[in-house]
């Protein structure tokens, strides 16, 4: 029972880390990476479709993304979707779409850093909520006399260690992201 609670909690914590990594991939760093365009939706025959389903997105060089629509007729629609995605990007269109990454100003870097810190804090809160749920489940088992007080204390210590591990992971990911943001 205790192991099930810990495993379930740890799975939820892993999902929180995945969400954080996904959020960090969308934070603009001045360097080109395909994840930046993952939230772009293209109007494809009247339906909003994710960009990666109508075009391939590749890194041409460190500051340029190359977007190649699968259908030539989609070039204008993809270009329009990227412009309207509110990412501050200005694609150049020919047969393929080149998306140059504008250099980040100091102010933009600070804003992106604040955004990254906010995402990290949300993840920490989520991890702590999972810890609280796990501890409540353990206390419930102890209250119903299904586990001893020693087992409860041991499980609580284990849960705290798991929580500390994931919080440290969030902190290291944030530190790496901030370092990446401040590189010129």
From Swiss-Prot:
One GO term of the biological process aspect: cytoplasmic translational termination
Transmembrane segments: none
KW Cytoplasm (keyword) present: yes
MF terms (GO), sorted A to Z: ribosomal large subunit binding
Sorted UniProt keywords: Cytoplasm, Protein biosynthesis
Principal subcellular localization: cytoplasm
GO CC annotation, single: cytosol
Subcellular location: Cytoplasm
Coiled coil: none
Pfam families with a match to the protein in the record: RRF (PF01765)
Purpose of the protein: Responsible for the release of ribosomes from messenger RNA at the termination of protein biosynthesis. May increase the efficiency of translation by recycling ribosomes from one round of translation to another.
NCBIfam families in UniProt: frr
Family: Belongs to the RRF family.
Protein name (Swiss-Prot/TrEMBL): Ribosome-recycling factor
Gene source species: Psychrobacter sp. (strain PRwf-1)
Organism lineage string: Bacteria, Pseudomonadati, Pseudomonadota, Gammaproteobacteria, Moraxellales
Gene: frr
